[in-house]
From Swiss-Prot:
GO molecular function, one term: ATP binding
Enzyme Commission number(s): 2.5.1.75
Protein name: tRNA dimethylallyltransferase 1
A matching Pfam family: IPPT
Tagged with keyword Ligase: no
Gene designation per UniProt: miaA1
Length: 314
């Protein structure tokens, strides 16, 4: 069965919509949800990632949730292999694979069946030594000189992606982006729906979302994960909210530090949303729906529009 994909910025209600769609199809078509959020892969990282609690999943099978320990490194290539296998297995059972998430590379690696550039451990080790010597900012400046286009989309503090880009540029002799496939027909002919809303409204939702995360126990969740190795995790330690809380804990965890962590989490999430919008909006295959209004009638209209687009594609 042809998959349905729901993408869009953080805070637009993608996960809730997926469950509502599965409910709407209940008794007609079985639906299984496949996560495409990098940090929801991690066990124990629930509150800060916006993971739908088990009790609220309404018995709908979910895949690619809670599959990694916080000390394990999440990779796009590893996710692509596992999620593609899930999607094909779901379809083979006659069920609808519903891919949901906002991690840009994870979504595109699946929909465009990326082939990943080769790796060279010796070259990577050399760049990692360089990183240890000069730090993330100066290494990123090196990427600016070698591949300005890659540097423009890789955040200054994302040392892991900076190292990978420099490795690929050295191996291939071409810009990092040249290794990415062109956007064509989506894999499995998936219907792709994008959710977004007015910036002012989304900013308000992100502020409320951040407050709710802290009120529900994000700080306690981070503290509980520290003995599990959260601070050592290459990927998990960079998650929005978790990184900011760990900094506050290092600073003494007083009221001022924790308030700052909440403010910085909200600001970082807004910056991330801008990157998500920039990335997803360039994909002309996406049918965008406005999730600004949250009334029951408008929600019903969105569900009908999503199902209509999927049925037409099928």
């Amino acid at each position: 069965m042809r998959p349905l994909t729901i993408i869009g910025p953080t805070g637009t209600g993608k996960s809730d919509l997926a469950i509502e769609i599965a409910d709407r199809l209940s008794g007609k078509i079985a639906v299984e949800i496949v996560n495409a959020d990098a940090y929801q892969l991690y066990r124990g990282m629930d509150i800060g990632t916006g993971k739908v609690p088990l009790a609220q999943r309404r018995g709908i099978p979910h895949h690619q949730l809670d599959v990694l320990d916080v000390t394990e490194t999440a990779t796009v290539a590893g996710y692509q292999r596992s999620a593609a296998a899930d999607i094909e297995a779901i379809a083979s059972r006659g069920a609808l694979p519903l891919l949901v998430g906002g991690s840009m590379l994870y979504v595109q690696s699946l929909l465009d069946d990326w082939a990943f550039p080769a790796k060279d451990p010796a070259i990577r080790a050399r760049w990692e030594r360089r990183l240890a010597q000069v730090g993330p900012a100066r290494l990123h400046a090196e990427l600016v000189r070698r591949d300005p286009a890659a540097a423009a989309v890789i955040p200054l503090n994302d040392a892991r992606r900076t190292v990978r880009a420099l490795e690929v540029v050295e191996i291939t002799g071409r810009p990092y982006a040249a290794s990415a496939p062109r956007i064509g027909s989506p894999r499995w002919d998936s219907a792709i729906i994008g959710l977004d809303c007015e910036t002012k409204v989304l900013d308000e939702r992100l502020a409320a979302r951040t407050k709710a995360m802290f009120d529900r126990g994000l700080i306690e969740e981070v503290i509980s994960l520290l003995p599990c190795g959260l601070a050592r995790g290459v990927t998990a330690s960079r998650a929005l909210g978790y990184a900011q809380v760990m900094e506050a804990l290092k600073a003494g965890a007083d009221t001022q530090a924790l308030d700052s962590a909440r403010q910085q989490t909200c600001l970082a999430t807004r910056r991330y949303v801008r990157r998500q919008r920039s990335w997803f909006r360039r994909d002309r295959r996406v049918r965008w729906l406005d999730a600004t209004v949250s009334t029951a009638a408008h929600r019903t209209a969105i569900i009908e529009a999503v199902l209509g687009a999927w049925r037409r594609a099928s």
